[in-house]
């Protein structure tokens, strides 16, 4: 059966002016196709598009359906609805050209339909089928035209008709393609039909037709049609056509009067003719309308031919008299106003073409101009009379010739056709010439002789013949092909015969009537039998048809199943009867062969009896063979058949018993093997003879198969012969060519043997390795075991002429019928009778339908408008039909699996078998995030589940009917057979979903995006910690998940007071993050609306973040980290460190992981205060976990696909909180809860850094520290990435904002997210800094950085133009966030600190919010931001501080979020941006002077700050990852701080608390719970040295190594030649260097984590006292290269990119020549492990405080001497947060761990002392290179090394920001300011430390650096500091340490607490669990030069 025609109408609803026109065009088109192909052969569907940019809903029915009234009604209804929507909706804001929109619509249409699905129809379909809609169609009724099946081009069987207006003029074409200038066809082609789309069209065998719906009357007066002809040419190139709607509607003539007077009225050609020509294949079309040649000449008055040219003529109608004779056209004269239709003349129309004759072209052109027609005399060679013609010009090369048919000529035609002429007819033409009359008489007489005598014809025959005036009795034999239309059917003729037979009294004419009827009946029955494939009947069997018996009548009324069964039974009967026939009918075959015309050329065929003996026969056939080979024109197939027949006849004549066996032996005497043939023709060049012999050998063997079926019983022999045939055919192919072989097989072999030995032919094709032709495929029998057709056992009868395979008998009829019944029950719908292999095998051999991988953003596409816009270019997967499961014919060919969510939603629970075993048993453990508990039953499903191939009912029947199969080993997986492991792990049943807090809010059963394991663990860990924090609460959950294994102890040690609040907050928030795979039932967005209550932020309601409760705010799931693999996920639980390892492609970007980890830690270890801040942080983290929702909320703002939506900060409560803090001005300093209630405007940015929010128990300060986005800024997608987007609409800059994320809260409006890859920080906020961090820490932002080369994008130098404080800070935050996000951490992941770029971006942002940082990811340099000289962050800080103060009782420790008063006013200065140059361009942030004066802070705030600072800075958790507190501070102080870290890092930091050692000073003791991302850039107001000039860093080319990329990103942002300017704000608060603690967490065999707490960042302690050292800044010597320092020898192995957070942008961190900053924190070595006498951070003495090694030991040698412990958690910056860590005083002078680490820019004397390394050697030497950032002089002053210390001067909140945005700031901070530099270096160090997972500690024990949150938790943990002196006693030390270190929370500068408990190995934190490490230990990879 011919395949059906698939037609899709793609209707443009943009123009609804002429609705009726569009309807009529569509209807006439469908009507035409139905008439042409048959009503039952057309399947259609429709799609709508709006070329003006609006959206159209998909139709209710998305499948291809048969034509019917109901479908048309639905089409009209939906079309009207689309018009209505198009009229009401406003055009899209995106400026997409019409061509682009059409291209997208074509892509979707091609992907939505199954174009290649075969049409499965039962061969026993009843005569009438009543569809479900009541339409009755006759199955055997040929509804299509009598055109051959191949009339339609195979490609046109799949057609897309685009119904839209086509551009006509050049102007319209330019608007269509949105291009200007020259519109070449190629340009338009690239816009509309790019090569990718053309490939899809070609692969799916689809033709695209453009149906121009525009009214052509509108263009009649226009002379510019260049656009239209360009489109025509374009469509021709893709084998498409443009169809004018006028040709279909036929309205051209009616409206011709509207055309201009000079134009020629169009020809009224039937639209069917136009469509036939345009749609159907050219070769076949030419067969139907053959061209004929003609001669056109014009004779002058003098008789000379003035014009004589050859022309070609094509008929317009098939009714015309077609002839190949020559037509002569003689032009006679001209005429005007010719209207043939009005004249009522019958005409034949021909199209005349000539493109060569210039004279003719001139003539036609002249005729067109003068509106003239020419009269011509037309003469045909076979015409009796000449005719009159009218020539009408169409164009210069074409004209229309209308030949008038007069009545006389019509009469002549009738005479020819009718075949009977009466005397009256002759009289009628008596006036004709005698010669004509004689010819006519001759014709008539010949007709009379051939016709039967005039006899009465039966009435019914007269009626039939009367239907056509041209039919005569001679046509009756050709009646059958039209019988279906005329009504003469087999049954009808049989009934006539029976009726006539009943009459006994027959007259003479009645007898003739009866005889004619009998003949016709027999003829039709025979034809029907042959077509039905029932075989050839015996000659004497007159009546082969089946009488219309009552049984047969009854069958008509039976159900379809019974009809099929009975039909099959009858077929078996017929086959059984046929099998009794003699095998070949030699007599008939010989007679036929003898009758052939070629028989004369053959030697005389001897009779079998003429052979005297067998030898005579053999010699005869051999001679005959030689003659056949020599005769090239000899018919090889006929010869082979004759030979076999002769042999068998002889054997029969001698009475042989085994005729076939003996015949085979005789024939084999003629066989030659392929080897023999090669040898014989080795030297023979006669190719023809060789080919002839090969063909003879093939035909001999095939004929033997046919005439000697017994050989087919021997499978071995059969296989050998087939192999030999194959070898011979290969010789043919080699001798000629494969094309010759293909033709030989298809033309000569298939046509003769396809019906007799199809399987053998298939085997031959298979052996050749070529594709089996479709014709053969249709005939091949089913291979099913239950098939009734076992051809190998059946005796072959005569070859069947039908292609429909006949059913061969295989035993007794009863057995066959039983088999039939069984099969019918089993395969009710599988249509086994159809021999299509794909159908017949459905139940036996399970088809291995390839299950495509889950569509990346399939759900996003449905839920996110932005994503849809971005994905329009991609073909959308076909939507499986709802009823597909119930229909086998549908199900077999569904190429795409249904989405798991849909399947699960429909699947009964009883069938919802999970792919993981023991799910219930381990349900209690499911929320812990450990995927090890889930063990896949099968790693790979090799076969598609049965239920995907057959309907359930059919499957059950098959299982019952074939119990043997039910015992098969195939296990039926009732859910999608193949899923990524992460999907399986993430999936939870609805009940389990509710149980787990880690669940994300997602309506889908499966996570739309993979969720980071790290994030999961962090969240779960934080939850556990919170649960433990509750006073008196015992561990609720066992420490068995990786989170608990890694952080269990830490969590358990969380201070109880915060536990309840955090738990409550978490509950309220419904932590999305808890289950990476799952979203909590309540999506964060849902919670977000409630955020007013919790955090005071209506994040969800902010316009930016549309509230989509189902979309988890954490979109990370959707954002698949490209590198993340399912296998890694399996191992995640086993090795959490691996997850954190950036190098592992499977795992998410390390930054993300770190950030998450830190978040977990932050949540886990809130502060000792137990401030709600931690809780809020946890909430934030949780919310961050549900970035999807955030994304959804923000998706509106983001036009880019949801790459970074995961980071939607708006969603995350933390972001909201941050927003609150961002607008402290708006929010009173009252209790943070009040701020929370304030709403979007007063969003407190709950950033872990600033525990200000802590006081607000419900607002998750840290919840998504990295991502916290100012909820108030709904528009800014920056917030989307929790890390990055802190931007709140609140004008005031959120001091507390998540440092990493949106430092620039004000920037909230600008969607940071807009173009992740290319988003430019143009207007600081405008371009989402965070666009898509490659490694979004929390947000599962796509790992690919939005800024594709964020590293390269450098923030243009930021001028110090002041901008509104709020906005500036916001913008800074946003910029930082964007930078972070823009520079994916992976990109930064190379040693380049991720923050480097962000920090620079932040700097630039800080410098000027308005200035667009332009983070063009790759190379676009960030536009210069005008430095915000007075970026007043103070307002926000004050309010923040006030709010913090108000809450200080509960959140003193949490005041980290608060920015010191210094920061407030001078943050503006800090924000004054340095400049970030393009790739590796040096980022110089000059913060002229950022005096952090308490002036900006209200007295209350100051008090609060002092209290906070005095309270051990324990609450200070600097989110150093993305934006350290330095970033916040630097927002005010320097832009460099802003770039401290990428958003992801910031997210990692759970909280930062600022503890002022002295009442007047605010020291940040950063306990970073954040992820281990690099420490934020320290804000060093005290280092005025750098103020003067910006530290310059030389740009270097990027390294390919991943670990270089981070460094590279940082390097880009830094300008080495310019020393970092760090204006030291003259704030009273000292910048306390953040102490970074390296926490090595080893998993013990017991499953409990063993934590070794090590202080690593003492290196970059800076005296934050601005007043004391306001000008202290480290300047690099003029020629000093930041890379001239040696790397720490311990980092010999390069870290994997993900592990190392981007190092500071400082050139000191850069590796020379590697353009990437490779900052490794040697301090990250575990103190216990390091025995260096130089007070290396690895000091093992528990009682010894962790102090930076003496400055004399800062040398690289000392560093190199350290034990090779490469992992250090630099994120412990906020360890001071715990009051119990008093020992961290900076006074010790050396970082307990950072001894080998070069100092950061020395803001404080400590830094200077330590940075004594020549050239300001950066104390932190990562990997054998020492960075020389700090001038040696300054370094010497500071004994403690500073990697990148936060300026204590910066607010603790800023420090927190810096921590969070540490990575960002690192990127930004390079060279921007000394403090910035320090902070950046710290960040880099912190990043390195935390990312040190890449490093293998010298001990070879994988130690996981603990994230900031973890460190914070550790420091606060009572276990760690039991019996230790309170941190208050150590204020001085801490202040000293943090003066530089605070700002650099991540810097290992912090000395080891002298408190022995802190250092002692007894502390659970100090104990390293050898089994597991928090982060993967990586050996540093070698640098790639």
Swiss-Prot record:
Residues 823-837 have a biased composition (Basic residues). Disulfide bonds: none annotated. Residues 999-1026, 1085-1097, 1201-1224 have a biased composition (Polar residues). It is found in: Nucleus. Keywords: Cell cycle, DNA damage, DNA repair, Nucleus, Phosphoprotein. Residues 1144-1156, 1191-1200, 1225-1238 have a biased composition (Basic and acidic residues). Pfam families: Treslin_M, Treslin_N, Treslin_STD. One of its GO terms (molecular function) is chromatin binding. Residues 964-974, 1105-1114 have a biased composition (Low complexity). It comes from the Eukaryota. Its main location: nucleus. Signal peptide: none annotated. GO terms for cellular component: nucleus. The keyword DNA damage applies. Phosphorylated during interphase. Cdk2 promotes both phosphorylation and formation of a ticrr-topbp1 complex. InterPro entries: Treslin, Treslin_M, Treslin_N, Treslin_STD. Residues 574-609, 791-858, 894-974, 999-1033, 1072-1156, 1184-1243, 1849-1875, 1938-1966 are annotated as: Disordered. One of its GO terms (biological process) is mitotic G2 DNA damage checkpoint signaling. Interacts with topbp1 (via BRCT domains); interaction is cdk2-dependent. Component of the replisome complex. Regulator of DNA replication and S/M and G2/M checkpoints. Regulates the triggering of DNA replication initiation via its interaction with topbp1 by participating in cdk2-mediated loading of cdc45l onto replication origins. Required for the transition from pre-replication complex (pre-RC) to pre-initiation complex (pre-IC). Required to prevent mitotic entry after treatment with ionizing radiation. PANTHER family: TRESLIN. Belongs to the treslin family. This is Treslin. The lineage of its organism: Eukaryota, Metazoa, Chordata, Craniata, Vertebrata.
């Amino acid at each position: 059966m011919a395949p059906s025609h698939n037609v899709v109408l793609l209707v443009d609803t943009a123009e609804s002016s002429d609705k009726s026109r569009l309807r009529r065009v569509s209807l006439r088109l469908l009507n035409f196709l139905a008439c042409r192909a048959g009503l039952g052969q057309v399947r259609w569907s429709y799609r709508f598009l709006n070329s003006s940019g609006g959206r159209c809903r998909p139709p209710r029915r998305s499948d291809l359906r048969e034509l019917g009234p109901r479908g048309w009604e639905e089409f009209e209804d939906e079309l009207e609805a689309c018009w209505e929507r198009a009229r009401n909706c406003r055009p899209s804001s995106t400026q997409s050209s019409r061509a682009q929109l059409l291209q997208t619509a074509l892509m979707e249409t091609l992907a939505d339909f199954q174009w290649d699905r075969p049409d499965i129809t039962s061969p026993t379909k009843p005569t009438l089928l009543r569809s479900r809609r009541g339409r009755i169609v006759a199955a055997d009724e040929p509804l299509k035209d009598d055109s051959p099946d191949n009339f339609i081009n195979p490609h046109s069987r799949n057609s897309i008709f685009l119904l839209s207006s086509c551009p006509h003029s050049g102007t319209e074409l330019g608007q269509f393609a949105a291009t200007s200038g020259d519109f070449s066809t190629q340009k338009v082609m690239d816009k509309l039909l790019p090569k990718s789309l053309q490939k899809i069209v070609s692969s799916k065998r689809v033709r695209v037709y453009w149906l121009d719906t525009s009214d052509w009357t509108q263009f009649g007066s226009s002379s510019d049609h260049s656009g239209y002809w360009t489109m025509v040419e374009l469509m021709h190139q893709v084998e498409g056509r443009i169809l004018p709607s006028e040709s279909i509607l036929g309205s051209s003539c009616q409206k011709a009067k509207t055309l201009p007077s000079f134009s020629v009225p169009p020809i009224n050609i039937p639209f069917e003719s136009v469509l036939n020509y345009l749609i159907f294949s050219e070769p076949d079309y030419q067969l139907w309308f053959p061209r004929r040649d003609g001669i056109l000449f014009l004779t002058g008055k003098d008789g000379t031919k003035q014009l004589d040219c050859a022309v070609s003529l094509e008929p317009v109608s098939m009714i015309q008299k077609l002839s190949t004779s020559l037509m002569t056209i003689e032009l006679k004269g001209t005429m005007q106003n010719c209207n043939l239709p009005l004249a009522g003349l019958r005409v034949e129309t021909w199209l005349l073409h000539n493109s060569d004759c210039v004279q003719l072209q001139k003539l036609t052109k002249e005729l067109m101009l003068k509106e003239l027609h020419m009269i011509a005399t037309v003469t045909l060679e076979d015409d009796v009379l000449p005719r009159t013609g009218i020539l009408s010009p169409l164009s210069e090369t074409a004209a229309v010739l209308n030949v008038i048919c007069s009545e006389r000529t019509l009469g002549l035609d009738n005479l020819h056709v009718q075949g009977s002429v009466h005397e009256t007819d002759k009289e009628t033409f008596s006036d004709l010439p005698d010669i004509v009359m004689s010819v006519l008489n001759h014709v008539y007489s010949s007709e009379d002789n051939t016709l039967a005598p005039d006899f009465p014809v039966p009435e019914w025959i007269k009626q039939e013949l009367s239907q056509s005036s041209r039919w005569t009795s001679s046509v009756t034999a050709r009646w059958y092909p039209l019988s279906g239309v005329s009504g003469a059917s087999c049954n009808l003729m049989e009934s006539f015969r029976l009726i006539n037979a009943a009459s006994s009294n027959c007259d003479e004419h009645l007898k003739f009537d009866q005889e004619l009827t009998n003949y016709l009946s027999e003829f039709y029955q025979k034809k029907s039998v042959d077509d039905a494939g029932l075989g050839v009947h015996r000659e004497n069997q007159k009546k082969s048809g089946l009488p219309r018996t009552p049984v047969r009548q009854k069958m008509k009324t039976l159900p379809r199943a019974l009809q099929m069964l009975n039909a099959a039974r009858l077929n078996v009967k017929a086959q059984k009867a046929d099998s009794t026939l003699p095998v070949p009918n030699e007599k008939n075959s010989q007679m036929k062969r003898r009758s052939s015309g070629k028989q004369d050329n053959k030697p005389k065929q001897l009779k079998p009896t003429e052979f005297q003996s067998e030898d005579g026969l053999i010699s005869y056939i051999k001679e005959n063979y030689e003659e056949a080979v020599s005769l090239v024109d000899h018919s090889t197939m006929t010869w082979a058949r004759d030979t076999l027949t002769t042999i068998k006849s002889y054997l029969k004549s001698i009475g042989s018993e085994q005729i076939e066996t003996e015949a085979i032996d005789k024939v084999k005497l003629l066989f030659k093997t392929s080897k023999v043939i090669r040898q014989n023709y080795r030297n023979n060049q006669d190719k023809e003879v060789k080919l002839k012999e090969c063909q003879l050998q093939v035909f001999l063997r095939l004929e033997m198969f046919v005439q000697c079926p017994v050989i087919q019983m021997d499978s071995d022999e059969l296989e050998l012969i087939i192999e030999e045939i194959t070898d011979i055919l290969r010789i043919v192919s080699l001798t000629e060519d494969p094309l010759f072989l293909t033709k030989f097989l298809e033309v000569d072999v298939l046509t003769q043997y396809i019906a007799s030995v199809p399987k053998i032919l298939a085997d031959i094709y298979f052996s050749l390795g070529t594709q089996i032709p479709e014709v053969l495929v249709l005939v091949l029998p089913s291979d099913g075991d239950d098939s009734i057709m076992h051809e190998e056992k059946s005796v072959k009868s005569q070859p069947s002429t039908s292609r429909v395979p006949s059913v061969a008998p295989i035993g007794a009829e009863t057995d066959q019928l039983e088999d039939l019944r069984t099969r019918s029950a089993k395969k009710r719908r599988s249509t086994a009778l159809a021999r299509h292999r794909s159908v017949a095998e459905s139940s036996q051999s399970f088809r291995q339908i390839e299950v495509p991988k889950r569509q990346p953003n399939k759900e996003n596409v449905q839920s996110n408008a932005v994503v849809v816009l971005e994905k329009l270019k991609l073909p959308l997967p076909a939507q499986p039909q709802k009823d597909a499961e119930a229909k086998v014919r549908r199900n077999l060919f569904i190429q795409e699996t249904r989405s798991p969510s849909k399947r699960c939603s429909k699947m009964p629970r009883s069938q919802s078998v999970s792919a993981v075993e023991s799910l219930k048993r381990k349900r209690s453990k499911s929320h812990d995030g450990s995927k090890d508990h889930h063990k896949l039953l099968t790693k790979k499903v090799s076969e598609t589940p049965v239920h995907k191939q057959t309907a359930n009912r059919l499957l059950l029947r098959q299982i019952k009917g074939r119990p043997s199969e039910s015992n098969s080993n195939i296990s039926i997986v009732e859910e999608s057979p193949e899923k990524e492991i992460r999907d399986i792990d993430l999936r939870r049943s609805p009940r389990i979903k509710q149980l787990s807090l880690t669940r994300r809010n997602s309506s889908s059963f499966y996570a739309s995006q993979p969720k980071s394991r790290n994030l999961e663990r962090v969240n779960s860990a934080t939850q556990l910690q919170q649960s433990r924090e509750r006073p008196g609460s015992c561990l609720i959950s066992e420490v068995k998940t990786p989170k608990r294994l890694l952080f269990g102890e830490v969590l358990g040690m969380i201070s109880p007071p915060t536990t309840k609040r955090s738990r409550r907050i978490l509950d309220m928030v419904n932590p999305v993050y808890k289950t990476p795979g799952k979203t909590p039932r309540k999506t964060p967005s849902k919670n977000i609306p409630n955020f007013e209550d919790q955090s005071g932020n209506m994040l969800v309601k902010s316009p930016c973040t549309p509230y989509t409760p189902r979309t988890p705010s954490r979109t990370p799931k959707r954002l698949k980290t490209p590198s993340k693999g399912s296998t890694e996920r399996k191992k995640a639980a086993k090795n959490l460190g691996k997850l954190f390892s950036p190098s592992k492609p499977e795992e998410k970007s390390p930054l993300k992981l770190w950030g998450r980890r830190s978040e977990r830690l932050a949540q886990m270890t809130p502060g000792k205060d137990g401030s709600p801040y931690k809780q809020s942080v946890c909430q934030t983290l949780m919310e961050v976990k549900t970035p999807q929702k955030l994304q959804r909320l923000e998706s509106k703002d983001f036009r880019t696909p949801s790459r970074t939506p995961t980071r939607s900060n708006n969603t995350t409560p933390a972001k909201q909180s941050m927003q609150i803090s961002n607008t402290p001005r708006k929010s009173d300093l009252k209790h943070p809860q009040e701020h929370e209630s304030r709403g979007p405007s007063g969003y407190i940015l709950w950033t872990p850094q600033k525990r200000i929010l802590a006081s607000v128990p419900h607002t998750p300060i840290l919840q998504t520290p990295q991502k916290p986005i100012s909820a108030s800024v709904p528009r800014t997608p920056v917030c989307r990435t929790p890390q990055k987007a802190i931007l709140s609409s609140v004008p005031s800059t959120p001091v507390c904002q998540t440092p990493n994320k949106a430092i620039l809260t004000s920037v909230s409006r600008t969607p940071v997210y807009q173009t992740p890859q290319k988003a430019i920080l143009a207007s600081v906020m405008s371009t989402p800094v965070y666009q898509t961090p490659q490694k979004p820490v929390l947000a599962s932002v796509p790992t690919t950085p939005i800024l594709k080369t964020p590293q390269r994008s450098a923030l243009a130098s930021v001028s110090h133009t002041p901008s509104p404080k709020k906005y500036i800070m916001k913008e800074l935050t946003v910029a930082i966030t964007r930078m972070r996000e823009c520079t994916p951490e992976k990109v930064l992941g190379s040693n380049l600190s991720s923050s480097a770029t962000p920090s620079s971006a932040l700097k630039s942002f800080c410098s000027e919010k308005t200035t667009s940082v332009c983070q063009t990811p790759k190379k676009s340099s960030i536009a210069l931001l005008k430095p915000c000289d007075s970026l007043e962050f103070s307002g926000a800080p004050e309010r923040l501080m006030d709010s913090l103060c108000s809450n200080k009782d509960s959140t003193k420790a949490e005041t980290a979020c608060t920015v010191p008063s210094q920061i407030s006013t001078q943050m503006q200065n800090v924000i004054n941006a340095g400049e970030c140059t393009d790739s590796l361009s040096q980022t110089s942030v000059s913060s002229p002077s950022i005096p952090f004066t308490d002036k900006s802070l209200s007295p209350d705030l100051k008090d609060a700050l002092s209290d906070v600072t005095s309270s051990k800075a324990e609450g200070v958790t600097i989110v150093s990852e993305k934006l350290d507190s330095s970033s916040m501070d630097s927002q005010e102080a320097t832009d460099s701080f802003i770039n401290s870290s990428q958003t992801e890092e910031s997210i990692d930091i759970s909280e930062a608390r600022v503890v002022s050692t002295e009442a007047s000073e605010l020291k940040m003791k950063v306990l970073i719970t954040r992820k281990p991302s690099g420490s934020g850039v320290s804000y060093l107001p005290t280092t005025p040295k750098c103020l003067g000039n910006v530290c310059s860093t030389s740009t270097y080319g990027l390294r390919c190594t991943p670990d270089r990329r981070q460094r590279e990103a940082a390097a880009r942002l830094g300008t080495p030649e310019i020393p970092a300017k760090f204006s030291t704000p003259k704030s009273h608060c000292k910048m306390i260097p953040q102490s970074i603690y390296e926490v090595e967490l080893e998993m013990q065999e017991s499953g409990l984590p063993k934590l070794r707490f090590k202080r690593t960042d003492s290196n970059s302690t800076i005296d934050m006292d601005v007043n004391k050292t306001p000008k202290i800044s480290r300047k690099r010597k003029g020629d000093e290269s930041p890379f001239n320092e040696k790397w720490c020898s311990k980092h010999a192995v390069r870290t994997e990119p993900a592990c190392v957070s981007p190092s500071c942008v400082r050139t000191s961190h850069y590796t020379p020549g590697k353009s990437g900053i490779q900052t490794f924190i040697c301090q990250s070595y575990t103190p216990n492990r390091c025995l260096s006498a130089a007070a290396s951070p690895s000091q093992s003495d528990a009682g010894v405080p962790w102090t930076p090694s003496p400055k004399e030991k800062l040398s690289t040698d000392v560093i190199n001497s350290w034990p090779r412990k490469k992992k250090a958690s630099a994120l412990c910056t906020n360890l001071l947060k715990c009051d119990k860590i008093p020992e961290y005083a900076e006074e010790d002078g050396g970082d307990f761990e950072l001894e080998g680490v070069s100092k950061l820019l020395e803001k404080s004397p400590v830094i200077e002392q330590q940075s004594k390394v020549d050239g300001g050697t950066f104390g932190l030497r990562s990997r054998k290179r020492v960075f020389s950032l700090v001038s040696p002089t300054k370094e010497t002053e500071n004994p403690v090394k500073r990697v990148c210390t936060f300026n204590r001067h910066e607010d603790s909140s800023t420090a927190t920001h810096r921590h969070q945005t540490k990575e960002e700031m690192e990127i930004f901070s390079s060279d921007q300011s000394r403090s910035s530099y320090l902070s950046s270096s710290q960040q880099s160090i912190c990043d390195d430390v935390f990312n040190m997972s890449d490093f293998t500690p010298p001990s070879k024990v994988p130690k996981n650096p603990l994230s900031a949150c973890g460190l914070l938790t550790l420091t606060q943990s009572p276990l760690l500091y039991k019996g230790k002196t309170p941190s208050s006693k150590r204020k001085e030390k801490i202040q000293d340490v943090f003066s530089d270190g605070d700002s650099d929370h991540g810097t290992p500068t912090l000395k080891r607490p002298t408190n022995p408990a802190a250092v002692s190995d007894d502390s659970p934190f100090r104990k390293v669990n050898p089994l597991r490490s928090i982060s993967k230990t990586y050996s540093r990879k070698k640098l790639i030069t």
